[in-house]
Amino acid sequence: MSKDEAATPPASFDDFMKIDIRCGTVVEAAPFPEARKPAIKLVIDFGPEIGIRKSSAQITEQYSPDTLVGKKVMAVVNFPPRQIGPFMSEVLTLGVANERGEVVLVTPDSYAPDGSRLH
């Protein structure tokens, strides 16, 4: 485990419950050449309660835009929007580093409806 991956200080269950992590389906994906680090712009459908949200994800080593449309992803939907260059990212799409340090997306391993909350 690298120093960047070291465990963070303990959090309470109440802290965890403040983070709203939902399942969504990528409906659009496009290159994001204006980003400082290689990234892909995502448009994600989180169902009728949350709706469509945008995200920038640094996932170009493992994915191309055409492979992402239709893919289920997990994202934090209640962080404030963040300006990434000329793009406003509305959710934080979740991923983990593989053995080569490349980010791979966190996805449900079987069907989950759009908008489903992580428990």
Please describe what each predicted stretch is.
Residues 1-119:
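Phosphate-backbone binding interfaces of nucleic-acid-interacting proteins
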